[in-house]
Swiss-Prot record:
Keywords: Ribonucleoprotein, Ribosomal protein. Belongs to the bacterial ribosomal protein bS16 family. The lineage of its organism: Bacteria, Bacillati, Cyanobacteriota, Cyanophyceae, Oscillatoriophycideae. It comes from Trichodesmium erythraeum (strain IMS101). Residues 89-101, 109-129 have a biased composition (Polar residues). Signal peptide: none annotated. Disulfide bonds: none annotated. One of its GO terms (molecular function) is structural constituent of ribosome. The gene is rpsP. The keyword Ribosomal protein applies. This is Small ribosomal subunit protein bS16.
Amino acid sequence: MIKLRLKRYGKKRESSYRIVAMNSDSRRDGRPLEELGFYNPRTDETRLDVPGITRRLEQGAQPTDTVRDILKKANVLELSRTGVNTQANVSVSHAESTEAITNAEPIQATANTESNEVSDSESTATATIRESEEQPPISES
């Protein structure tokens, strides 16, 4: 069975993760079938290859709990279920994604025209999420 999971890399206590498609019986840091994204928990930065992820999900790949949470935060699971605009480059802040989830409205994806180096056959979509550094305090009532 193919799983979408995190592959750890980086220094001690400065870890980052790649989101990869791997056989479920492979070791955590083994050779992946395909690299599909990046997650840095220290800076809360996430980059996702949206078409690659939706293709793997359609082929029956199962995301781990952590990867599922990352995909939900980026609205990739909703996009893959509805098939809406998975070819566009998506840039989403955490506040926008949270607001869209609570209001049950789809986030409008805008094409990223910054890099024109990639041809149409090689184009990959990416989703980027960045958590705000100032989180409101949690009050205990």
